[in-house]
Amino acid sequence: MKRAFIMVLDSFGIGATEDADRFGDVGSDTLGHIAEACANGEADNGRKGPLNLPNLTRLGLVKAHEGSTGKIAAGMDGNADVIGAYAWAHELSSGKDTPSGHWEIAGVPVLFDWGYFSDHENSFPQELLDKLVKRANLPGYLGNCHSSGTVILDQLGEEHMKTGKPIFYTSADSVFQIACHEETFGLDKLYELCEIAREELTEGGYNIGRVIARPFIGDKAGNFQRTGNRHDLAVEPPAPTVLQKLVDEKQGHVVSVGKIADIYANCGITKKVKATGLDALFDATLKEMKEAGDKTIVFTNFVDFDSSWGHRRDIAGYAAGLELFDRRLPELMELVGEDDILILTADHGCDPSWTGTDHTREHIPVLIYGPKVKPGSLGHRETFADIGQTLATYFGTSPMDYGKNML
């Protein structure tokens, strides 16, 4: 029985890539800077001491980081016995965003340039805004700018509740984000508005990767909170991913846990499981792994590393999240059967010590574990697509156009 379990620790980079200068990210290092802060006693809020990740270390995380950066992460064990195969991978795609990283992991790098709304104020074309107001029968809109999602709620949340005007905003990513109150505006109405925005952006040729629904609750600035009902409307990958090939060619199964289905625009997904928060995502993953049959991929995105701690530049929160993940990792490893493979990886970096609030261009860890996986270094990988090609070889689908088999 062949099964693959893919765990994406969203934004868990392990050191700047060779082309990081193109992105202003030279010196970024999500793992390294978190470990450094922990070792220096600068991340003792809600946790304490050096970064403690013994299970990820056994799978080769510290070695992969050393390969990427040339140094051992502060306070971590560079001499621990390694029981998995490990690598550090460079991104071939032109961006450092979520769809590009995930699509490349599945064998389809993004070699075109996304469209962006680069103006920090009055970010969106008036023609687009007018169409959204007309089609969705809106009283107007708020925002129309670059912003952090939590900051803009404090700034505009109360006005949104009074006026019913949705909050439109963007970032350095190829995104159009819409924040609305779940109760006063309504979740279904928000989703409908996002569908309209997705249509207009596609028909208008803006080449925007994602429209993101950002529902929130609360009644005044300071207590607004985003809920777990986020929904991403992505464009479809430009070619069949290894997920699609497993389903189409082998009548296999692909289980999405978390936001995976949204990222791939449901292409190659046979089952969707929603869960919010690190523990809930872990629990849902364990359940699906226990139930998975032959020719199945269980694919989970642990979004909190990115959304709750990376973008918010919360080093202590990120460290605590990693330590929670590591404590629960043996539960996953126990479910890996004789012919199974477990792959732990990331889609980009989001260094919580870095300036600004955006992603960072970094190598990602590729940690592969299974009874038949030979432990040791798989070296520097030129593309995340090596993961997709490895899966294609493992399941016996037709080969991907990019990437090399690592096993």
From Swiss-Prot:
Tell me how the cofactor is bound: Binds 2 manganese ions.
Q: GO CC terms for this protein?
A: cytosol
Instruction: Name the residues that bind Mn(2+) 2.
Output: 306, 311, 359
Q: Which residues form a coiled coil?
A: none
According to the record, the signal peptide region is none
Which residues are Mn(2+) 1-binding?
A: 10, 347-348
Q: Which GO terms describe its molecular function?
A: magnesium ion binding; manganese ion binding; phosphopentomutase activity
Q: Which GO terms describe its biological process?
A: 2-deoxyribose 1-phosphate catabolic process; 5-phosphoribose 1-diphosphate biosynthetic process; metabolic compound salvage; nucleotide metabolic process
- Extract the InterPro entries matched here: Alkaline_phosphatase_core_sf, DeoB, Metalloenzyme, Phosphopentomutase_DeoB_cap_sf
- Source domain of life: Bacteria
CDD domains per record = PPM (cd16009)
According to its UniProt record, the EC number is 5.4.2.7
Return the Gene3D superfamilies for the record.
Alkaline Phosphatase, subunit A, Phosphopentomutase
Q: Where in the cell is it found?
A: Cytoplasm
Q: In which pathway does it act?
A: Carbohydrate degradation; 2-deoxy-D-ribose 1-phosphate degradation; D-glyceraldehyde 3-phosphate and acetaldehyde from 2-deoxy-alpha-D-ribose 1-phosphate: step 1/2
Which reactions does this protein catalyse?
Answer: 2-deoxy-alpha-D-ribose 1-phosphate = 2-deoxy-D-ribose 5-phosphate; alpha-D-ribose 1-phosphate = D-ribose 5-phosphate
Q: Keywords, A to Z? A: Cytoplasm, Isomerase, Manganese, Metal-binding
List required co-factors: Mn(2+)
Function (record text) = Isomerase that catalyzes the conversion of deoxy-ribose 1-phosphate (dRib-1-P) and ribose 1-phosphate (Rib-1-P) to deoxy-ribose 5-phosphate (dRib-5-P) and ribose 5-phosphate (Rib-5-P), respectively.
Q: Into which family does the record put it?
A: Belongs to the phosphopentomutase family.
Q: What is this protein called?
A: Phosphopentomutase
Q: Which organism is it from?
A: Salmonella paratyphi C (strain RKS4594)
